[in-house]
Amino acid sequence: MAKVNGHASDAEISALNDAKTHVARGIGRSSDLIFEKGEGSWVWTVDGHKIFDLTSGIAVSALGHAHPAVTEAIVKQASKLIHTSVNIAYTRPYLELTTKLLKVMPDKSLDTVFFWNSGSEAVEAAIKLARVATKKQNIISYQGSYHGRTWAAMALTRSKTIYSKGYHPLMPGVYTAPFPYGSQYGCPVPLSEDQLTQAALRDLKLLFDQQTAPTDTAAIIIEPVLGEGGYVPCPPAYLAALRKICDQHNILLIFDEVQTGFGRTGTYFMTEQTGVRPDILILAKGIANGLPLSAIISRKELMDMQEPGTQGGTYSGNAVACAAGIAVADVMQEPGFMKNVAARSKQFFDVLHDLKQSPKTKGIIVDVRGKGLMIGVEFDGPLYPSRDQSKPVPEGLAAKVQKKCMEKDLYILTTSIFQVIRLIPALIITGKSSAQAQMHADL
């Protein structure tokens, strides 16, 4: 790895490494690195290693590291007012960000905002709203879904058992439906999108008939693109069918756009591409480019069913975080921003589709998928029989690819119980930087 000047001294690095032993073991991480600086698509470790970042802090730093507009907004707001608590009074950034978000909502019915700090908290807020508004209890989530690690959000999460291991019993009233995803069904032959949609709808009907009656079901929560479950776009026809089912039975449809929101999929929200209106939209991650901020947005008629005091939090809608969110919103409105996302998406997908068909990897890469700059690459693996028995693949191939990329100063992440790597670069990544990243990985 190449080093740069100005890195920490050996004594400082030693002290930092000693501090690692006092960090809670329950935190999982994909490397033992210590980052000190970031700029655009690059990060530097304390010992001076420069690494190309295709993780964006797990889809958070959408505008790249230390974006000047965001940095300026943070400094300016911090010099005026950092915190008062939304439970005491409004702040100007809170109200200004509310106005900016409502202008870009995928449906005008989404007209009322509640800010919180993290994606998990926003999911909890959505559950509370759904139960109050419908006067029903049960929630349906999806196999492979990830909604967070707090108590209720953890109960909805079905991507990996590690997130709830040892913490049962969890929040009751949660039921699980299959997501329309071929690997989740264990299909040896890829099914068409229509076949997956019909199979998943049939299983959802069975869930209603056998486990949770529609009259007991408050909400269905779904990610328009499955995140931790493998970066799998949900078929629009399935989402449209969900909308009809929810309307028929007074069930609220919740879209968890924590990871897909704010330009990640090539539009402001993935909801725009589906053509389906959610009752509650959950946002976080890219909303403030790294500062803790999340939101749920719904109809005023639903939000007004909650009595004052039933939602809130000491830090929710923090003034500095909202100021960062305003800067993000302004940058995303600049001419050419979304065009760059589309161009870089095509650049990555073209290379990956060619790689999938190359003799070296044919039969090993089984799928290249995603939307915008939310890209998943799935390898064959031992969880199910190989599609090509003449080319058996080793166990843990995704993790091995990740390790090899790290050795070449390229930081990527794996995801799901299947063999999937995910590429989530900053949305401001240039064509030159994209080509450089692909060269680093020999893509």
Model-derived regions: residue spans:
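Conserved N-terminal phosphate-binding loop of PLP-dependent enzymes in the Aspartate aminotransferase
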Residues: 2-443
